Amino acid sequence: MDVQPATRRLILSTATRFFDPLGLICPVILPFKIMFQNLCKAQRDWDELVDTELNQGWLSNLSDLRLAGRVRFKRCYSEGLGENEVKSLQLHCFADASEKADGAVVYMRVEYESRVECEIMASKTD
């Protein structure tokens, strides 16, 4: 991704660029959505360059986005789900909200006879 000076249009484009139906990269995309909301509230033009402080946040968020490319998620939540040794399977949902955004995440916890596995299943922000 080329680093360009931040504008309202570019921030929205970045926030909506990714196909993420399970919401696994929501924490990385959320700062772009919040920046866009703030620019809308300030009634900034679509192609107007943001001020220096917001541009620093833009650059920091882009850096986080690049680092997120290194994160890997398993396609299979738990390799041993078909095994007889499953003692319990639980879904844990956590949610929180603020004035700027809200979010929720769901984890699956599988307890086996000899181990416990916990994997993220999905998340959502607004």
Where are these regions (language model features)?
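Conserved acidic
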Residues: M1-D126
